[in-house]
Amino acid sequence: MTDVLAATDETMIAPTLAPTEALVADLAVASGEEITYSQSAGLIDRLARMGVSLAFTSYQSGCLYMLGASATHGPQLHISGVQKPMGLSIDAQGDLTLCAGVSVIRYQNVLRPGQQINHIFDACYMPRTIHTTGDLDGHDVGVDNRGRIIFVSSWFNCLTTISDRHSFEPVWLPPFISTLIDEDRCHLNGLAMEDGEPAYVTAVSRSDTVDGWRDRRDGGGVVVDVRTGEIVCDGLSMPHSPRMHNGELWVLNAGAGELVVVVRDGPGKGRFEPRVFCPGFLRGLALRDGFAFVGLSKPRYKRFEGLPLDERLAKTDSSPWCGVQVIDLATGGCVDWFRIDGPVAELYDLAVIPGFTCPMAISPGSPEAAALITHADRLES
């Protein structure tokens, strides 16, 4: 690679724009295990036919992953380092928003249509705005129809937005939380947007005491309507990643390894219907064109102690794994998959990136961020 950034109408050549090797090497050395990636034979072709790529996060490895394929260089897994990456979303403008440790980061694609990085990547997400929030334990994130970032603070049990002056500005508290306080009481985690507004959240319990949710992991989980404060579904095990798709509310019943749909026959509380079992603790869900992209994680302490997932895995004679499964919603079958083996055992969130088949992202504060310079086409008069 060249030491000088060069840009043409078609291609930008940038120095060391893929820190994958260094990140993977550090993880492997620290754990004493090799990291391996595998995928189903049809995954890359499926993404290409859909005109999309995948982004997913692992706070355990400190990595933002982007999976796609180049027409000339084949499948590509680009990995960029980020402090504790958690929830991510792609908004209507195509920008990527990420909750990451003590900050919320807005990435923008800096390439023009037809441009590529190093003849491979057709989108390059640069961290353009970094809001320092402090440690709020940010989880799911979305952007409303006014361009306002809305994210879940598990530590403060609320939906919040960024503030120019303060660490955060609270937006909404669940009705069972009595006060805004820095205690993770119910483990609020998931956020579903609908029509550009916060619509539903998931919580592990309705507990209103510090760490109360830990004793309610099996069966204490709820889905709450943000607009009314109603509990629309309960009895879940550590629910995560609520998402709206074609008028239906889908949720990952993580502690049972289930993709479920919430059914409401009228006003008031509904029920959840399991549609698919996946062998892992489920977090990260994106739905598109009749398919669900589901993130799977292995247990943190060898077993999913106290969760239905342990029994389900034993019953199906299955081992948990880390990766992404593509589920056909019409049949419930897993039609494609991507798997990670080795020291990376946990994912948090994933998103489908439409319109780009081989994206990459730049790590904040990295040499790559310093080297990749772009500018507007003309001076503003």
Which role does the model predict for each range below?
Residues 36-50, 82-93, 131-148, 177-199, ...:
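Beta-rich, blade/repeat-based domains predominating
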Residues 73-142, 286:
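Blade-loop segments of beta-propeller domains
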Residues 320-325, 329-381:
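Blade-level signature of beta-propeller repeat domains, shared across WD40, Kelch, NHL, RCC1
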Residues 73-79, 126-131, 169-181, 228-234, ...:
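A short beta-strand motif characteristic of beta-propeller blades
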Residues 38-42, 236-265, 270-329:
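Loop/turn-rich, solvent-exposed surfaces of beta-rich toroidal or solenoidal domains
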Residues 56-59, 91, 97-103, 143, ...:
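Conserved beta-strand positions in repeat-built beta-propeller and related beta-rich domains
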Residues 63, 103-105, 158-160, 219-222, ...:
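A short loop-to-beta-strand structural motif that recurs across blades of beta-propeller domains
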Residues 39-51, 105-115, 201-218, 295-319, ...:
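Short, conserved, GDST-rich strand-edge loop motifs in beta-rich repeat architectures
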